[in-house]
């Protein structure tokens, strides 16, 4: 009887250990799938930013900001909230109604994701004309984003800090 209970105990512990290993491997695979999906959604956000910057679509330029976002631009007070960001955008476009973005490229690196939040560092290059008669202007800048995963799995910018 004693030998049977020892064998049963060993079998139980071995099964328990195998279950833990299998569960942790499954969790790792789930985390990897989630991380891959997050990276794909963040890349979509980047592509949307490029597309909407080139077209200067007012609605599109607001779509990648979270409702409670904060944007820091050089020489300006921070825009706190999506409505404040939109107001600043509208003021800029009223000041330069003939603005034309000729080219825009961004490259993000060092994307770190943790618990529905991400941060990233980006470099941007653009060429634009403030009016049809103005000469083209080149601009290079860096940007730091804090991103927030939305309930639908998409990502939005929660904070953006731009430097030149």
List the model feature ranges, each with a label.
Residues 1-11:
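N-terminal Sec-pathway targeting helices
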Residues 36-43, 58-116, 123-125, 135-139:
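A solvent-exposed, acidic/Ser-Thr-rich amphipathic alpha-helical stretch
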Residues 133-134, 153:
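Conserved glycine-rich acetyl-CoA-binding loop
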Residues 126-130, 147:
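Beta-strand elements of well-folded, non-transmembrane domains
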Residues 15-67:
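Short, low-complexity N-terminal intrinsically disordered segments enriched in polar/charged residues
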Residues 22, 140-164:
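Short beta-strand edge/turn micro-motifs at domain boundaries
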Residues 110-118, 148-154:
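A short, structured loop/turn motif at beta-sheet edges
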